[in-house]
Amino acid sequence: MRLIPLKTAQQVSKWAAKYIVDRINTFAPTAERPFVLGLPTGGTPLQTYKELIKLYQAEEVSFKYVVTFNMDEYVGLPKEHPESYHSFMYNNFFNHIDIQPQNINILDGNTDDHDEECRRYEEKIKSYGKINLFMGGVGVDGHIAFNEPASSLASRTRIKTLTEDTLIANSRFFDNDVTKVPKYALTIGVATLLDAEEVMLLVTGHNKALALQAGVEGNVNHFWTISALQLHRHAIFVCDEPATQELKVKTVKYFTELEQRAIHSVLD
């Protein structure tokens, strides 16, 4: 496990974007051997997408041979709805880079057969071998994608009922009206995430501090989905200072010293 303790959320976004670009460029993808990137939605990664667009515009990276898989999508929300994750991804990222449309994969929450859609998604991921890097965010209760507390750590892509806490948290995108938030979503499973070669979680803000503490110092258990990343062979938590406030001082000190070079790659 790596923990990258930075000062601000802006530094988190820059570090994450640079890391993604470095991984893509080192991989040197081709049409026959694309780089497979897992992506989230939500407020936390939004600035990272802006940083990635800047790096693309500066010709530091191309997404032509990058294949993407998104984490989740609401059930029953039309793709063209402004709060669908299809709309989010195209408006905030895909429309601004050179990714090929056929390389974009997002779950279809409007299909008549949700189980078949989830099975198809898993098979599509397997057809590429693996996801090379999965970027994600985390909820205040430690959920990743829509793997809410008590989700099976062996779960695969499936339909999930959203918790009341998630409905309330997401209502800010629906005129603060909980009744407008879809009650169900299709989401990758915890095991789907753990299958990725690398997982990078962005954790910012004091409201995420308990989740980060559970992920780094807590025991592995299904009530804190984030804790499953302790089982991953290459998990990276990129966090700002407020998010580290529930960690032990010696934990932060240890990773700060260990990751000096990585930290200064953003600060310099």
UniProtKB/Swiss-Prot annotation:
Recorded catalytic activity of this chain's protein: alpha-D-glucosamine 6-phosphate + H2O = beta-D-fructose 6-phosphate + NH4(+)
One Pfam family named in its UniProt record: Glucosamine_iso
Pathway: Amino-sugar metabolism; N-acetylneuraminate degradation; D-fructose 6-phosphate from N-acetylneuraminate: step 5/5
Catalytic center residues: 72 (proton acceptor), 141 (for ring-opening step), 143 (proton acceptor), 148 (for ring-opening step)
Catalytic activity, EC: 3.5.99.6
GO cellular-component term (any): cytoplasm
Function comment: Catalyzes the reversible isomerization-deamination of glucosamine 6-phosphate (GlcN6P) to form fructose 6-phosphate (Fru6P) and ammonium ion.
UniProt family annotation: Belongs to the glucosamine/galactosamine-6-phosphate isomerase family. NagB subfamily.
Subunit-level organization: Homohexamer.
Name of the protein this chain belongs to: Glucosamine-6-phosphate deaminase
Taxonomic source organism: Histophilus somni (strain 2336)
